[in-house]
């Protein structure tokens, strides 16, 4: 098993303490990625055969292996904290005390109820205290938690808590606007609706002016 970074461990512990960690079996089953892919491919073969698909066809023959590789290496890679991004946090020597906002962060996740796509954008803001973070690291944290089976409400809060933990401040805000393909492509088949979730901490929750400044940046993206 890969050794986790200190940052990954701290974030995981913070989410567990708040009841916000993604539901995982306990104890975690130890298995290397190749073995995991092999088992997933075997189960996908059975599913496709039950759907009466011909896996002898050259278009379908490698699909179980492709899906297994995609699940482990890409769309669900955020289930493994060994993949948590390397975080660069530096001392706030400039004494920045105004809002830092990153808008239009693209994200693609997977609805944990139907295993179909959630496609959206995030806006993340924080007010620095003793530390500032490399801006691209915010995008990577969003991508990490998006790379799991998710519900949007939990995803929003996970990003918030991760940044609060890494930055040592409660002054963090996250908003996500997303289209859920479990609504768009099945069931009611509503192709135009979107879902917005917001999680606010510190001054973003207690100060009306700070909250409104953040929400204006969300509306104007």
Swiss-Prot record:
Zn(2+) binds at residues 111, 114, 182. Belongs to the GTP cyclohydrolase I family. SUPFAM superfamilies: Tetrahydrobiopterin biosynthesis enzymes-like (SSF55620). This is GTP cyclohydrolase 1. Homomer. Pathway: Cofactor biosynthesis; 7,8-dihydroneopterin triphosphate biosynthesis; 7,8-dihydroneopterin triphosphate from GTP: step 1/1. HAMAP family: FolE (MF_00223). PROSITE patterns: GTP_CYCLOHYDROL_1_1, GTP_CYCLOHYDROL_1_2. One of its GO terms (cellular component) is cytoplasm. Keywords: GTP-binding, Hydrolase, Metal-binding, Nucleotide-binding, One-carbon metabolism, Zinc. GO terms for biological process: one-carbon metabolic process; tetrahydrobiopterin biosynthetic process; tetrahydrofolate biosynthetic process. It comes from Erwinia tasmaniensis (strain DSM 17950 / CFBP 7177 / CIP 109463 / NCPPB 4357 / Et1/99). Signal peptide: none annotated. Pfam families: GTP_cyclohydroI. Its EC number is 3.5.4.16. It comes from the Bacteria. It catalyses: GTP + H2O = 7,8-dihydroneopterin 3'-triphosphate + formate + H(+). GO terms for molecular function: GTP binding; GTP cyclohydrolase I activity; zinc ion binding. Gene3D superfamilies: 1.10.286.10, 3.30.1130.10.
């Amino acid at each position: 098993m890969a050794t986790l970074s200190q940052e990954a461990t701290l974030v995981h512990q913070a989410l567990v303490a708040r009841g916000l960690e993604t539901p995982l079996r306990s104890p975690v089953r130890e298995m290397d990625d190749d073995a995991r892919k092999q088992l997933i491919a075997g189960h996908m073969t059975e599913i496709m055969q039950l759907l009466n698909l011909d896996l002898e066809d050259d278009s379908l023959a490698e699909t179980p292996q492709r899906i297994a590789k995609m699940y482990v290496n890409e769309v669900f890679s955020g289930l493994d904290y060994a993949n948590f991004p390397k975080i660069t946090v530096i001392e706030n020597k400039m004494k920045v005390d105004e809002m830092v906002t990153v808008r239009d962060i693209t994200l693609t996740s997977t609805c944990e109820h139907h295993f179909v796509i959630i496609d959206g954008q995030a806006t993340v803001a924080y007010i620095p205290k003793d530390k500032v973070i490399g801006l691209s690291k915010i995008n990577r944290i969003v991508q990490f938690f998006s790379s799991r089976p998710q519900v949007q409400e939990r995803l929003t809060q996970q990003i918030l808590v991760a940044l609060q933990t890494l930055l040592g401040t409660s002054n963090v805000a996250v908003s996500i606007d997303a289209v859920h393909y479990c609504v768009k492509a099945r069931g009611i088949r509503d192709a135009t609706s979107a879902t917005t979730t917001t999680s606010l901490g510190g001054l973003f929750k207690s100060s009306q002016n700070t909250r409104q400044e953040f929400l204006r940046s969300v509306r104007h993206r």
